[in-house]
From Swiss-Prot:
The protein, known as: RH-like protein ID
InterPro entries (alphabetical): Ammonium/urea_transptr, NH4_transpt_AmtB-like_dom, RhesusRHD
Gene Ontology biological process: ammonium homeostasis; ammonium transmembrane transport
Gene Ontology MF term list: ammonium channel activity
Family: Belongs to the ammonium transporter (TC 2.A.49) family. Rh subfamily.
Annotated keywords: Membrane, Transmembrane, Transmembrane helix
Coiled-coil blocks: none
Role: May be part of an oligomeric complex which is likely to have a transport or channel function in the erythrocyte membrane.
Subcellular location: Membrane
RNA-binding listed as a keyword: no
Any single Gene Ontology cellular-component annotation: plasma membrane
Membrane topology: Multi-pass membrane protein
Amino acid sequence: MSSKYPRSVRCCLPLCALTLEAALTLLFYFFTHYDASLEDQKGLVASYQVGQDLTVMAAIGFGFLTSSFRGHSWSSVAFNLFMLALGVQWAILLDGFLSQFPPGKVVITLFSIRLATMSALSVLISAGAVLGYVNLVQLVVMVLVEVTALGTMRMVISNIFNTDYHMNMMHIYVFAACFGLSVAWCLPKPLAKGTEDKDQTATIPSLSAMLGALFLWMFWPSFNSALLRSPIERKNAVFNTYYAVAVSVVTAISVSSLAHPQGKINMTYMHNAVLAGGVAVATSCHLIPSPWLAMVLGLVAGLISIGGAKCLPGCCNRVLGIHDSSVMHYNFSLLGLLGEIIYIVLLVLDTVGAGNGMVGFQVLVSIGELSLAIVIALTSGLLTGLLLNLKIWKAPHAAKYFDDQVFWKFPHLAVGF
């Protein structure tokens, strides 16, 4: 019988993290330089503001969104920040190396930092499926593999299907959810006997998670419009995302009350349902011609999110063989697929309306992009999950899942192990 005492990462974590940081520093020293061009000052400020919005979404929004677990709130917030900081550095280098041939010095611009932040967001979404089961060393491995897989997927899609930055990045929801669920499928699933309540939410952490959801709700229009080049497309993306998430809020509160026998609102449902519209319109936000369509999508997405939260967890966890505490499947993969379908429909209508006979080709291209993203996500996720199962990472014992005391010093508490 294995010991229930926590496995210390005192030597493993500093050695791994600091060695990696030193390697990244050397890579930045030899292979990068800042953009020396004279950019329009107004454009520079606008670009920085969008990047700032994305950083707030990543650090505060996703950081607090996963902090609702009883006994695991500290780790959720801090580990997300750690993954973000590491992921952005690696994504800047990777995007630079993959985007130029022959290889040369990587030019760092505000746009490249924005792109890297969005790539790192993929890891934060995926990590929701494994937080509580893994330690920081395992998360370091997950960050490196997922950012590499996402960057490779984007490069392949861009070269094969000739898509722009916005389109190949908006596969991020489906990609991140499939990657995270694949990793979770490979990890030990059941909580130890007597510790099943550790992945349940508590009142104060749940309020913190709602704070994260509010930050995401405010800045989601910036995320959906960040990579669009045309001012008209950016404007449409901002407007449509705002309408969609606004309707999602009304739907989430109303349907949550309707679903409870006594008409009470479930805060757990609220965390993700208020964001459902933003995920659903992400791919097609610049193509939606009218506010009412974005509002309908927000309504449908909110219904799917609430319905999934109420009906699917037990069924999906049992069928898929995972323990998806952060409900990744129906909050990102299902809504991401809905968004992809809506994009294909709008693209077909736009192509037919323009008298273009390439409708079938456009549909095949869109389906090909989505299929490739899913295949790469599932394959790389399975490989990552198998890699994280190696004993060298000193994974937490099942009895210490969702337990902050494994990783943090609590001066007012006894050790208790």
